Amino acid sequence: MAKEKIRIRLKAYDHRILDQSAEKIVETAKRSGAKVSGPIPLPTERTVYTILRAVHKYKDSREQFEMRTHKRLIDIVNPTPQTVDSLMRLDLPSGVDIEIKL
């Protein structure tokens, strides 16, 4: 018999908000009696955008901007119905993207 598992993947641009959200999820799951592994930090995705500083010429003068996407992974093993219910009611910040797989 395979174990039931909920896999939660969090993404955010700000790592502080991401870590706070992960701690809320872990605390809520542990309070309801489920076994939690994580938060596991996944590799940070770094996207670099290069643009010209000038409008028409001066191609050698460029500026670079980067956007970092931080990720965390949380596994909840053998969740109870109370665990699922409490996770559904959990209020998280708006800057965090949550992906849940059952």
UniProtKB/Swiss-Prot annotation:
Keywords: Ribonucleoprotein, Ribosomal protein. One of its GO terms (cellular component) is ribosome. InterPro entries: Ribosomal_uS10 (IPR001848), Ribosomal_uS10_CS (IPR018268), Ribosomal_uS10_dom (IPR027486), Ribosomal_uS10_dom_sf (IPR036838). The keyword Ribonucleoprotein applies. The keyword Ribonucleoprotein applies. It comes from the Bacteria. Involved in the binding of tRNA to the ribosomes. Belongs to the universal ribosomal protein uS10 family. This is Small ribosomal subunit protein uS10. The gene is rpsJ.
